[in-house]
């Protein structure tokens, strides 16, 4: 778990945008918070897992994927903005994310 600050929030946003721009072969300027990961960008759930791995390494976290899976069933992610918010919650709360509601 990590205490979030504005710099971390901006870093997460940049990493997510750069990741999807590269994976989906589009410019970051074409991606907005409202961009649908699947229908607008052609992304998939494996990209979400890859991002979790990137952030867990970056912030030195051990995250149980089952916990994240349970949380995401209750809080599905469809847009880039929702994905960024979930990544921030994972970074901030780690495995305790399951206790959020």
Annotate the PLM regions.
Residues 2-43, 47-53, 57-101:
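Phosphopantetheine-dependent thiolation modules in NRPS/PKS and related acyl-activating systems
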């Amino acid at each position: 778990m990590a205490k979030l600050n504005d710099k971390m929030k901006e870093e997460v946003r940049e990493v997510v945008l750069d990741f999807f721009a590269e994976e989906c072969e589009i410019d970051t300027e074409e991606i907005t918070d409202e961009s649908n990961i699947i229908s607008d960008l052609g992304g998939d759930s494996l990209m979400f897992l890859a991002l979790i791995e990137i952030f867990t390494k970056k912030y030195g976290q051990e995250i149980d994927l089952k916990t994240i899976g349970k949380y995401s069933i209750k809080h599905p992610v469809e847009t880039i903005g929702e994905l960024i918010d979930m990544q921030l919650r994972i970074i901030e709360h780690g495995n305790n994310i399951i206790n959020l509601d």
